[in-house]
């Protein structure tokens, strides 16, 4: 016989800013088309170590393949991690893994998961203490 424990769902508080590390980055093709899927871990504070998944829409077609459109959440995330001058023409998702950024957290419309709030994503200031 194997005993199982129980872990209640934990949601980060909506509207608060957190610092994140990207544990993994993958392109996923699902119900909402192609998306950049990021597994994120919170850094610092009482919620340190909390892990959740966030998705950002990416575009694709037969002629151009997959690409990040200007002005999207995916672009905002990549530039926060790799810098404003990052070359988005030939990006490998592996380059995002281990990257860090800060953003405001929101809760999905159905109240079941956290998400990173588009428009709030940025670089962690250089003067911030290490984690």
Give the role of each language-model region.
Residues 1-131:
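Short beta-rich binding modules
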């Amino acid at each position: 016989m194997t005993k199982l424990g129980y872990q209640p769902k934990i949601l980060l508080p909506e509207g608060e800013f957190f610092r994140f590390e990207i544990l993994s980055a993958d392109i996923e093709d699902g119900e909402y088309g192609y998306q950049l899927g990021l597994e994120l871990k919170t850094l610092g504070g009482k919620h340190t170590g909390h892990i959740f998944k966030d998705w950002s829409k990416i575009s694709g077609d037969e002629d151009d393949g997959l690409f990040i459109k200007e002005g999207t959440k995916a672009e905002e995330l990549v530039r926060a991690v790799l810098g404003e001058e990052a070359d988005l023409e030939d990006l490998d998702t592996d380059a995002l893994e281990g990257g860090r950024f800060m953003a405001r957290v929101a809760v999905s419309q159905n109240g079941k998961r956290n998400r990173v709030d588009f428009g709030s994503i940025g670089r962690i200031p250089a003067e911030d203490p290490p984690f």
